[in-house]
Amino acid sequence: MVEKVYNMTYSDKRTVEMLISDENVHYLHMIFNKGEGLPEHFSNSNVYMTVLKGILSIALNEQIIHEYEQGSVLKIPFKTKMNVGNKHDEILELIVVKAPAPVK
């Protein structure tokens, strides 16, 4: 096989999984229930977030929280302060792509 296949977790439980981590890209899958999310942090690359399910609540730098529904794709610049979470009853499911891959 030329391709390499990766499998995402399908769950109702909090999930943060790195599916692909190579020299080109980091490709993550995340699932958050109401009140869950990531600790506040700064983006370590350009970040592309796709909302697969639910409503994303996100504050960037000093902005107020903005909300994005299923089907939204966000492009977030390198070194942006991020506060990512789910403030709604419906499960939030995201794909996060970091490109280029962050340098350690």
Regions found by a protein language model. Name each.
Residues 45-56, 61:
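Glycine- and acidic-residue-biased ligand/ion/polar-headgroup-sensing regions
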Residues 26-43:
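Conserved short histidine dyad/triad with adjacent acidic residue
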Residues 63-78:
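Short acidic-glycine-tyrosine-enriched beta hairpin
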Residues 78-102:
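Ligand-binding loop in jelly-roll beta-barrel domains
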